[in-house]
UniProtKB/Swiss-Prot annotation:
Protein name according to UniProt: Tetraacyldisaccharide 4'-kinase
NCBIfam families: lpxK
GO cellular component: plasma membrane
Record bears the keyword Metal-binding: no
Keyword terms, alphabetized: ATP-binding, Kinase, Lipid A biosynthesis, Lipid biosynthesis, Lipid metabolism, Nucleotide-binding, Transferase
Pfam name, any one: LpxK
Native organism: Escherichia coli O17:K52:H18 (strain UMN026 / ExPEC)
Family named by the database record: Belongs to the LpxK family.
Listed GO MF terms: ATP binding; tetraacyldisaccharide 4'-kinase activity
Length: 328
């Protein structure tokens, strides 16, 4: 229902317009206060790169963060990552992730990023505290990438990158809750890079698509082509589950059942195992896998995806960030 409201297919969005105007007024006032320096943002001693959205979730932001961190690491840059840690609840903040940190403590995305990149990752509702925690333990970090946080103006930033769903774009264009917008589309004019996931990019935008890898068994780590798996039940607890189901079909998999879950939904063995019957195979997103690995069954697999950026602009962006991190 919410997708139909936000896309404009349902007329119910008009009933929510008063709340949207209020949201836009408050969020705009907050940004203006920081722009006029009526409120002071904290500036880190190292460059900060924000990777965020203009819309609510499901745009492919986390794969972009992983891509960015890995690309900078390959260039010899020491990177730290900070996040709000949505869906997690730590005993105290800031929380610096370790091999023992769970998604219940830190949230799905931070654990996934930590496991994929090995970079120092810290979470806190106050992102400046997370930055300070990383720099206290890893003083050699040269640049901070913040996963989400475009609207978190309390943290000053040197580079802003926005990830856009190229198929859904901005829906009906309205602020939450009548539409999907955290900020209006005009905000794109003031950011440093716009990365478009799928669809047809517009002038000045960087094209991106998600490239699926081999399926990985949660229990054994064994890998195989996902098309080799039989009697598949697909599960996705991400911002836009249909994208994952479409990816499976693109890989030659016709799921017997597709199970969309809420983003950041907590999972347990009983609920997940109930999704599959004898002889069926469960295939989930990598984001779900970080929550299920501790209690996984032998017939549970996940499909990792990597961001693939096209054109000349990614190299220019990476050169800019490498120069920033190196102090040039």
């Amino acid at each position: 229902m919410i997708e139909k409201i936000w896309s404009g297919e349902s007329p119910l969005w008009r009933l929510l317009l008063p709340l949207s105007w209020l949201y836009g007024l408050v969020s705009g006032a907050i940004r203006l206060c920081y722009k006029l320096k009526l409120k002071r943002a904290w500036r880190a001693p190292v460059p900060v790169v924000v990777v965020g959205n203009l819309t609510a979730g499901g745009n492919g932001k986390t794969p972009v963060v992983v891509w960015l961190v890995e690309q900078l690491q390959q260039r010899g840059i020491r990177v730290g990552v900070v996040s709000r840690g949505y869906g997690g609840k730590a005993e105290s903040y800031p929380l610096l992730l370790s091999a023992d940190t769970t998604t219940a403590q830190a949230g799905d995305e931070p654990v996934l990023i930590y496991q994929r990149t090995g970079a120092p990752v810290a979470v806190s509702p106050v992102r400046s505290d997370a930055v300070k925690a990383i720099l206290a333990q890893h003083p050699d970090v040269q640049i901070i990438v913040t996963d989400d946080g475009l609207q978190h103006y309390r943290l000053a930033r040197d580079v802003e990158i926005v990830v856009v769903d190229g198929v859904r774009r901005f829906g009906n264009g309205w602020w939450l809750p009548a539409g999907p917008m955290r900020e209006r589309a005009g905000r794109l004019k003031s950011v440093d890079a716009v990365i478009v996931n799928g669809g047809v990019p517009r002038s000045g935008e960087i094209p991106m698509h998600l490239l699926p890898g081999q399926a990985v068994n949660l229990r054994t780590g064994m890998r195989c082509d996902v098309a080799q798996l039989e009697h598949v039940v697909a599960m996705a607890g991400i911002g836009h589950p249909p994208r994952f189901f479409a990816t499976l079909k693109m890989c030659g998999v016709q799921p017997e059942k597709c199970v969309p879950l809420a983003d950041h939904q907590s999972l347990n063995h009983a609920d997940v195992s109930a999704l599959v019957s004898a002889g069926q195979t469960l295939v989930m997103t990598e984001k779900d896998a970080v929550k299920c690995r501790a209690f996984a069954e032998e017939n549970w697999w996940y499909l990792p995806v990597d961001a693939q950026l096209s054109g000349d602009e990614p190299a220019k962006l990476l050169a800019q960030l490498t120069s920033l991190a190196s102090g040039n």
